[in-house]
Each structure stands twice: as structure tokens, then as C-alpha cells.
Amino acid sequence: MDFANLAAQLNAGTILPEGIVIVTLMGVLIVDLILGRTSSRWIGYLAIAGLLAAIVALYFQWDATNPISFTGAFIGDDLSIIFRGIIALSAVVTILMSIRYVEQSGTALAEFIAILLTATLGGMFVSGASELVMIFISLETLSISSYLLTGYTKRDPRSNEAALKYLLIGASSTAVFLYGVSLLYGLSGGQTELNAIANGIITANVGQSLGAVIALVFVIAGIGFKISAAPFHQWTPDVYEGAPTPVIAFLSVGSKAAGFALAIRLLTTVFPFVAEEWKFVFTALAVLSMILGNVVALAQTSMKRMLAYSSIAQAGFVMIGLIAGTDAGYASMIFYLLVYLFMNLCGFTCIILFSLRTGTDQIAEYSGLYQKDPLLTLGLSISLLSLGGIPPLAGFFGKIYLFWAGWQAGLYWLVLLGLVTSVISIYYYIRVVKMMVVKEPQEMSDVVKNYPEIRWNLPGFRPLQVGLVLTLIATSVAGILSNPLFTLANNSVANTAILQATKVVSTQVSAIPAEKPDGL
């Protein structure tokens, strides 16, 4: 094979955005090695510049004529592009909110950013991976980096405890996922590429076998852990409470987006012959997530734990689009993750600012905050109201698109349950807003009474201000501009071959008469 044919098969230009992130990662480490601690003043901006360059590269790859690279191991189609963009953008905002937080914790900023970029790289590769080995390696890159980030503040015993819990539960979920993947490898006759696995299973007529069902259950369990879906959510509240706040901000968006990208690609490509079965399982997960997440959040006294259960509920809402299995369903998933990026990170930026100035994240301590810090109060109020689905904010339109897609697909009772639990969520969101805004001066918490003077010129506070303002504007404007954003999401689905081919494959599989399988 000559070099030209090899280059054509590799098509390495498809992973140019990931290449930019790798170069940025190496640049961060080299600059820190040369300059030491003095590099912390601007090393965050170097990482942000690299991530923005990667996002620009993704933009120029939109609707590429040949998205397949590395002989089918990675597909840079529009679906992967938009998920990779969400993950990279979440890393940008995370770095903005991390600079002051990490420096104040007494740990090295360069190493933190390097691990965060590694996690971003893993998430981006997961979003386009179409081969079992690449999926597993990318998923482990994201997972191991997340474990390290969770325990990064080594002097904090809560961070160490959170990292240990995350590692133990994460390792268990990885083992379960890997066993499910190994069953797929065996059932397909030794195939590792997703399309080849689906064809091998259909050819061997083992799609309805016990082995295929076990593989499906184990794969869904691994994905459920990554998206924080109940009952695979046990790690979420403790990790959210103990881990550094910028880390959980990234996990709540970047890791969740990677999990949903993997779910769409793996389930629609490999399991079209059991579509009704995996939709039934995800329906159960969605019901549990929406009910448990929203009901348990009512009793929380910590902002971080409240948002942990909120993220579980949000995963339940997003799963409605996945269960619908239509173009509108997938597009509404993508749109909701886009706006969730802005409104959730806006909320976490406010929590970081408040904790840096007061040292607490208890909900009761926010009482009367409006009179001391109007900008922070505005940002947190807008983000919480948007998460609750209050019009005309972005979260309202995100839920409208999800519920409408579910209704069109005949998921009537699931949509009604989503509406009811969404109303429940408004209570615990508005409770915080009311506490910040409505309280009289004499009802201020002791922490707010002693609130320090607001000084944005302190080291590391300016990036936090930029992150807060940008996410606040995006959360407010995304509702008004919901139609262009939904059109973008819809185009990403319409231009993705695997989602369009799934309809044809499902029809063909349903036409095959059921026979007793030869294998498991």
C-alpha cells in the first residue's frame, strides 16, 4: 500500500480539532516546565485560545464530504462535531472559573488545566468513536482524568473521599461496560467496528439471544453511570459535594454530553434489532431520574448537592429525546444540552464566586444576597429559573422541544410525568431565588452581613466575571434565539448518516422472521 492510499484511508484531518487540543496540552506542560509558577498568570488563557481554535476547526469541518477516518474507527460527522463543540466549550468556561479557585486552594494551575484538557480530549474522541477499542480507550481517558480532577485539592478530606468513591464506582461501571462490549465482540464473530458488529449479529441471527440482551443491559449500565441516570447515580451527590466546584461544573456538562453522544451512536448503530427493548430500559431510567432527582433535591441544604440531584433530573429530561428515536427527538436532545451548557455553568460560576467570598455553599447563607451582590444574584437567579423551565429563558424552550418530540412519538405519559416533575423542580429553584431577593435587611444571613467588598481586580477574578457575564447573556439570549439553535441541532441530525440509516435498518430487521438463535 503506497503512502497516498494510506493517507486517504486514515483521513487524519478529521481529528484536527483533537490535534489542536493535544498541541495545547503539550504547550501548557512545556511552558509550565520552563517558567514554573510564574506561568500561572496567563497559562489559562493559552489553554482557552487552544480550545477556541479547536472549536473554529470544528466549524470548518461542518458537513464534510468524507467524515470517516482511521478506517472507520472515528467518524467526524455533524453529530460528533456538535457534541465535540459542546465539550470543548464547557472546558473553556471551566478554565475561566478555575483560575482563581485553583490558585486559592494552593494547588498548581498548570497541572489542573493539563488534566482538564486530557478529559476534554477523551470526551471529544468518545463523541466520534465508532470502534470498540477506541470507544473504551477514549472513555477511560475521560474517566481517569475525571478521577484525578475530583481529588485534585489534596488537602481537602472531602475531595479525597469524593475521588475514592468516584474511582470505586467508576471502576465497577467500567468493568460492567467492558463485559457488555466483549459480548458484542463475541456475538458478532470478532468484529470491533460498530456497523460490522450490527451486521455480524444480524447475519448470525443472535439479535434476540440471551447474550445480546445481557450485552445491552451491561452497555446501558455503563452509559447510565456516565450520564448520572438513576439508579446509577449513587456517586453523583457525594462527588458533587466534595470535589472542586469547577470540576463538577465540567462533569455536569462535558461528561454528560460525551455519555449521550456515546448512547446515540452505540444504541442506534449496534442495537437496531432490539430498539424497543433499549427504549423500554431508558424509559425506566428516565422515570426514576426525573422523580428521584427532583423529589430528593427538595430536601437539600447545600447548593452543590441540590444541583447534583438537579443534574440527575436533567438527564431524565434529555432521555425523552433519546427514547423518542426520531429526528426531532435527537435534535431536541442536542438543543437542550447546548442550553444546559450555558445555564448550568452560569449557576456554578455564581456558586464559585459566593464560596470564594464567603467559604460556604449552604443555601440558607444566600439569604439577602441581592442587597450585597446584585450581579451574582442576577446570574444565579437567571440560571436557576432557566433550569426550572421558566419562560422566556433558554431552559423553557429546551423542555418544550423535548416534550413536543416525545408527544409526537407517542410518549404521552412520559411527557406528562416530565411536566409534573418540572413543576416540582421550580419549587426548589425559586426557593433559592426568593431567599436571595425577597428577604428584608434584618433577615440577612450572618455570612451576607459580613460579605466582603466586591473587587473584580483581584488576581483570577476577572476571568470569573467574564465567564459569568458570557454564560448569563447566553442563557438569556438562547431562549430568544432558540429557533436558529434548534435549526443547527436539527441539521446535525439530518446530515448524520447513521441516524438516517437506522430507520432503514430497523425496517429491514422487523421484516426478518423470528427464528431460534444459534448462539447464546
From Swiss-Prot:
Q: What is the name of the protein in this document?
A: NAD(P)H-quinone oxidoreductase subunit 2
Q: Where in the cell is it found?
A: Cellular thylakoid membrane
InterPro entries reported in the protein's UniProt record? NADH-Q_OxRdtase_suN/2, ND/Mrp_TM, Ndh2_N
Query: What does the UniProt function comment say about this protein?
Result: NDH-1 shuttles electrons from an unknown electron donor, via FMN and iron-sulfur (Fe-S) centers, to quinones in the respiratory and/or the photosynthetic chain. The immediate electron acceptor for the enzyme in this species is believed to be plastoquinone. Couples the redox reaction to proton translocation, and thus conserves the redox energy in a proton gradient. Cyanobacterial NDH-1 also plays a role in inorganic carbon-concentration.
Indicate whether Transmembrane helix appears among the record's keywords: yes
One cellular component term from this protein's GO annotations in UniProt: plasma membrane-derived thylakoid membrane
Q: Taking the first listed entry, what is the main subcellular location of this protein, grouped into a coarse class?
A: membrane
Q: Could you tell me which PANTHER family the record lists for this protein?
A: NADH DEHYDROGENASE
Q: What is the reaction catalyzed? A: a plastoquinone + NADH + (n+1) H(+)(in) = a plastoquinol + NAD(+) + n H(+)(out); a plastoquinone + NADPH + (n+1) H(+)(in) = a plastoquinol + NADP(+) + n H(+)(out)
**Pfam families per the record?**
Ndh2_N, Proton_antipo_M
Q: How does it assemble?
A: NDH-1 can be composed of about 15 different subunits; different subcomplexes with different compositions have been identified which probably have different functions.
Q: Does the keyword Translocase apply?
A: yes
Q: Name one GO biological process term.
A: ATP synthesis coupled electron transport
Q: Where does the chain cross the membrane?
A: 15-35, 42-62, 79-99, 106-126, 132-152, 167-187, 210-230, 244-264, 280-300, 306-326, 334-354, 378-398, 400-420, 466-486
State the similarity comment: Belongs to the complex I subunit 2 family.
